[in-house]
């Protein structure tokens, strides 16, 4: 992948990706089996030793938001939505998880969502389901 090639070109010793504790059952590329297979493929792909790490694998998304807020992460410049477009849709699974994480972390979500996206109050009332 392009990320891997870039890591090799700058002689980085690690590649990190942001799988978190809530991802395992939902996304195949966040499961332990995938991470182990990718780590093996990376080791076989080049003479350089590059380690695949998942620093947030035991963190909830709310934990990540809390820590990001402490570090001053510009959340308005981050992207979660799977639908694409100019704004987050506010309705897809990742948008709902994002909104729930900010709510649980008690951090203001600076994300502009598309018109018609459900409110956090309505999502909370429906146990974070549409």
Could you say what each language-model-derived stretch is?
Residues 2-4:
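Short, small-residue-biased leader/transition segments that mark boundaries at the very start
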Residues 7-12:
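Glycine-rich phosphate-binding loop signature in dinucleotide/nucleotide-binding domains
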Residues 15, 19-87:
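Catalytic subdomain that performs nucleotidyl-dependent activation
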Residues 26, 87, 93-116, 120:
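Iron-sulfur (Fe-S) cluster-binding segments and ferredoxin-like electron-carrier domains
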Residues 92-94, 129-130:
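Amphipathic, soluble alpha/beta structural segments
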Residues 116-130:
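Conserved catalytic region of serine esterases and O-acyltransferases that act on ester linkages
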